[in-house]
């Protein structure tokens, strides 16, 4: 097993190379570029330059798509806008040499006032993913998309749903272990290993505050939480762990050091 640790975020384009150098000096080997509100790397040459530097430093890049996406919106225009945002990430990601574009799949449709239509939601999101993958193939972009496990119970993204999407579309996946804990109130590592048998895992991890309805906010990752995660991860996979806590750089370094001592 090999695990690469790193934070979410690379900062503005003008300082991105310096940021990567800083991550490298700390021993970090992964970084997720957070396009939280927009795809702010516009220029193909900028993307190639950042990607070249990351490759030189042995840092694996990934992308997080904008948060304002929903492949299950009732409105076709919003579904199309979601696909465009994800595809914009894929185009830039191709030039960056990024491995995956992580995204939040969408919200559940409702059958009635209080009942989610999980089956219809799955089929709509699946169709959106297939259309996105078709565009990726058409453009010959070397990147995959990774729907993320989600931390709120009213949002599509249980481990079962993400696993099924992966199996039926060939998309990748992002296992957010903080989200899984918030949603399920515990993490069943054996079940996760059985559902996700691929050799490459992309994961998020941080401390999290949650309630009855799931995720509330991220917090600093505790030493004991890192140990619990790392001792339960499979030993036969290549794994990237992106930390999203308020202190994500130091938390990533701490996770790396704990892993080195296991």
Set out the residue ranges of the language-model regions:
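Acidic-and-aromatic substrate-binding clefts and catalytic sites of carbohydrate-active enzymes
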Residues: 10-16, 35-46, 71-74, 109-111, ...
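Expand to "…catalyze enediolate/carbanion chemistry for C-C bond making/breaking, isomerization
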Residues: 15, 20, 83-86, 119-122, ...
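Acidic (Asp/Glu)-rich catalytic clusters
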Residues: 20-27, 42-62, 88-97, 130-140, ...
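Active-site acidic/histidine proton-transfer and metal-coordination neighborhood
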Residues: 55-56, 72-175, 182
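C-terminal helical cap(s) of enzyme catalytic domains, especially alpha/beta-barrels
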Residues: 249-262
